[in-house]
Amino acid sequence: MRQSTLHTRLSTGPGGSMRSSIEIFNIRTRKMRVVWQTPELFEAPNWSPDGKYLLLNSEGLLYRLSLAGDPSPEKVDTGFATICNNDHGISPDGALYAISDKVEFGKSAIYLLPSTGGTPRLMTKNLPSYWHGWSPDGKSFTYCGIRDQVFDIYSMDIDSGVETRLTHGEGRNDGPDYSPDGRWIYFNSSRTGQMQIWRVRVDGSSVERITDSAYGDWFPHPSPSGDKVVFVSYDADVFDHPRDLDVRVQLMDMDGGNVETLFDLFGGQGTMNSPNWSPDGDEFAYVRYFPVE
């Protein structure tokens, strides 16, 4: 990978080990707080609907971190699914976890399991599929599916298991997440050459460009309050969404207005791949990575 002129790749410690810092940023007060730090690699925090814990992945497994008292990780029983990636989330009622795991087929498949733990239930027959967001009513979810090497956005009705294709092969389409009113799915797409933020109606009927920036914009997450979207931006010369780079964490209005850089951090892949807002929409969780000295 060619080094960026703005952001420089940093070296890691012995053996490439990293320190994960799970943090929370308040968009109203502009204050940050550290929840927990560890020498292990943790990724993609989801905030529980009751506001009590974060759900993250590490080494193929899921863990809960309490936001009250001792934040030491509690492993979730995911049954046979032991190669979970960072595309996971919690249903709006808190009863289900969605995971993306490749143990069964050697490719990422989407499963649902009780949030109390248990045997995962396969949802996607077409593979690979990477989960990214729940609909506000909890009746469907959206995901990135790769079919014949084409990246597109899909949704699935949970009861029927019917897969609906929402985008149609224009560039790479990835990272979808629902708006809180359930009318739009925000996603990132390279259809114009540079990865930017777009949105599509939940029935696929209309696609709109949201960002027009000089960066590679990834993983848009609309806030539950319906006024802001948080996302990660790489330098324009960075392909895909690698880890171990300085990236910008950006905030904007739902229509793409008032884009602002909140802060830079060392991370990228794993920082905020899946929904990460607090239930009230005032805060979001993310992971910052530090080289181990």
From Swiss-Prot:
Question: Where are the annotated coiled coils located?
Answer: none
Q: InterPro entries recorded for this chain?
A: 6-blade_b-propeller_TolB-like, PD40
Out of the domains of life, which is the source?
Bacteria
One Pfam match, given by its short name, reads: PD40
PANTHER family named among the record's database cross-references: PROTEIN TOLB (PTHR36842:SF1), PROTEIN TOLB HOMOLOG (PTHR36842)
UniProt lists the family membership as follows: Belongs to the TolB family.
* UniProt protein name: Uncharacterized protein Atu1656
Organism (species): Agrobacterium fabrum (strain C58 / ATCC 33970)
